[in-house]
Amino acid sequence: MLERKKPKTAENQKASEENEITQPGGSSAKPGLPCLNFEAVLSPDPALIHSTHSLTNSHAHTGSSDCDISCKGMTERIHSINLHNFSNSVLETLNEQRNRGHFCDVTVRIHGSMLRAHRCVLAAGSPFFQDKLLLGYSDIEIPSVVSVQSVQKLIDFMYSGVLRVSQSEALQILTAASILQIKTVIDECTRIVSQNVGDVFPGIQDSGQDTPRGTPESGTSGQSSDTESGYLQSHPQHSVDRIYSALYACSMQNGSGERSFYSGAVVSHHETALGLPRDHHMEDPSWITRIHERSQQMERYLSTTPETTHCRKQPRPVRIQTLVGNIHIKQEMEDDYDYYGQQRVQILERNESEECTEDTDQAEGTESEPKGESFDSGVSSSIGTEPDSVEQQFGPGAARDSQAEPTQPEQAAEAPAEGGPQTNQLETGASSPERSNEVEMDSTVITVSNSSDKSVLQQPSVNTSIGQPLPSTQLYLRQTETLTSNLRMPLTLTSNTQVIGTAGNTYLPALFTTQPAGSGPKPFLFSLPQPLAGQQTQFVTVSQPGLSTFTAQLPAPQPLASSAGHSTASGQGEKKPYECTLCNKTFTAKQNYVKHMFVHTGEKPHQCSICWRSFSLKDYLIKHMVTHTGVRAYQCSICNKRFTQKSSLNVHMRLHRGEKSYECYICKKKFSHKTLLERHVALHSASNGTPPAGTPPGARAGPPGVVACTEGTTYVCSVCPAKFDQIEQFNDHMRMHVSDG
């Protein structure tokens, strides 16, 4: 290809100088507008040269860009436009729209505050928001372990790319970034925090304090708030304790793959970033050694625990071997938000021993949860599949009684602990600077006695501090608490399975109590709809006349004594202790029974935020969201046709296999789809007056040959819950299903 330069005429040079405005950086553009970079290629026409130079940059007049390039046989002109700051302009426009409240389609809630933003920006800037938005959430609640200001700064960072972090708030930003999974902010905040450690590290050696506060060895809480800032600034060694406490807590909630990430950062900066002299013959400080030991102990515990994922059956209690003794831990199901072991706990008296529970780490996403593990009505529960031995009626004062009186397993565990060895207890200090009223974050400490296998469960409250160190054989675990001791379902309320409601509100669905067999009819207990704001559920008793829709009362599941005993004796068959008295259907798990009761009550607590359609189960809502997203994940391997549901693909495959398993009982004609058969039968029904297959039993047609009266006749679709009064509308609806595959 041959290239030649065309000399610029004086007229062209004068025109380009008149239209050129030089910026400080040397480029030419109008002030306040994005910088445009035009490159003219193949321009033999002088008229086009004038238009090009009127918009080109000043650097286009020098070097190889100072001329027009033309080639033989080419007459088309191509312009290359490069807007250097176009992305920043778009983000600034989006941020301005967010501040004005325009086009905001996502609500972020934290500590009762509400932040509005655009879902595209949140999904692009945070994997946490992306996972939530892919599930169809438009109202997202952030765990209340961080401040509103930290989340606000991170959202502003997504819109601007600029984040200003001071030394005092680096930990709060690091915690919030860990929850939102913003890796760039995590790396930068970790570096800032580590530099802060280097500034005050000599003070640690001088003060003689070996164990930082917040570690398992010190037994102190890693909680902090803005009220401590003055105290921490005057005491540098406490600042280091606070730093390590937050880093250790962050490493506990970041998954098995990054558990030692933050502690490793502290250790590595001890040698590199801090600029400390390193002698190969000198041992590490004791607190560095303890970091290694604690990190290795936690990794060994996580790797040796046999059950770290969900299981459909109730897991058996397991024994966890520690450095000194054994801890008897009953594994329960997981909470989806595993941040710092946030639970409501209370202080127990000395020498009390009770069975504690532990939630497993979240190894998979919400889509991989087995159906037997989660209560899909918006409440995550830790419910076993075995029937309860003793069921108590829920009363108005049950919530208070459950806190004052221990349950039977707790009483049984107290007896051997009375004669056991003494253990260190928790002491609260009224003037402690560690007291915090802003952030609610508790931890459950299980202290292992050196001379006994029994474990003592210490439960510090929110506003407590440790007066003396606890033994080094401790394991930080979380406790799954029940809202009440008598209400068996649900046991744990989490914010991840929210009910998507109107106006951005999240509600708790109705709950059902369980009653023992032979206890007689009891009224139902429903929970009043209320936002998930950390407050306990309020219950109201619904009397039997209130259920006017049904002739019989909706009772609690009745254990099948005869069938259960027969199955136990023979060792064969599956035990289904929960029976619905309305339709006599039996269930193995209690949560499945509760889901089934939605069919009778007609309650649909899950609502689509786009079309406002309600569903009884969360699974139905997730499947429905596919209709809005348009994702067709199931493809036919023969004709490459795609479908939104797997069931639609299975029905479609009958066409390729030539299966016609549906036969008309009138004309014996066969069909491959059930919908085609029902549509065909409906045509027979319209001609001879016979009610269609979806007609209720009470609506019967008249004599043969007479068209039945359509009043009271309902045509029910067998694919979806749609109902029609006219046969024409029913036929049109069935054609829609057939065309969909």
Swiss-Prot record:
Residue intervals of every C2H2-type zinc finger in the record: 578-600, 606-628, 634-656, 662-684, 715-737
Residue ranges annotated as compositionally biased, kind Polar residues, are 206-235, 424-434
In what way is this protein post-translationally modified? Sumoylated with SUMO1.
Per the record, the covalent cross-link Glycyl lysine isopeptide (Lys-Gly) (interchain with G-Cter in SUMO1) lies at 330
Q: Which GO terms describe its cellular component?
A: cytoplasm; nuclear body; nucleoplasm; nucleus
Q: Where is the composition biased (Low complexity)?
A: 404-423
Bias regions of kind Basic and acidic residues — which residues? 1-17
Question: Do you know which Pfam families this protein is assigned to?
Answer: BTB (PF00651), zf-C2H2 (PF00096)
**Sorted alphabetically, which keywords does the UniProt record give?**
Disease variant, DNA-binding, Intellectual disability, Isopeptide bond, Metal-binding, Nucleus, Phosphoprotein, Repeat, Transcription, Transcription regulation, Ubl conjugation, Zinc, Zinc-finger
SMART domains, alphabetized? BTB, ZnF_C2H2
| Location of the BTB domain | 104-167
Which InterPro entries did the record assign?
BTB/POZ_dom, SKP1/BTB/POZ_sf, Znf_C2H2_sf, Znf_C2H2_type, ZnFinger_BTB_dom_contain
Q: Could you cite one Gene Ontology molecular function of this protein?
A: transcription cis-regulatory region binding
GO biological-process terms attached to the record: cellular response to glucose stimulus; lipid homeostasis; negative regulation of gene expression; negative regulation of transcription by RNA polymerase II; positive regulation of glycolytic process; positive regulation of interferon-beta production; positive regulation of interleukin-6 production; positive regulation of lipid biosynthetic process
Q: What is the effect of changing residue 596 to R?
A: In PRIMS; strongly reduced DNA binding; strongly reduced ability to repress transcription; dominant-negative effect of the mutant on the wild-type allele
Q: From the record heading this protein, give the residue positions of the covalent cross-link Glycyl lysine isopeptide (Lys-Gly) (interchain with G-Cter in SUMO2).
A: 330, 371, 723
Gene3D superfamilies listed in its UniProt record: Classic Zinc Finger, Potassium Channel Kv1.1, Chain A
Where do the segments described as Disordered lie? 1-32, 203-235, 350-440
**Assembly and interaction partners:** Can homodimerize. Binds to DNA.
Q: Which named protein is this?
A: Zinc finger and BTB domain-containing protein 20
Q: Which organism is it from?
A: Homo sapiens (Human)
The encoding gene is ZBTB20
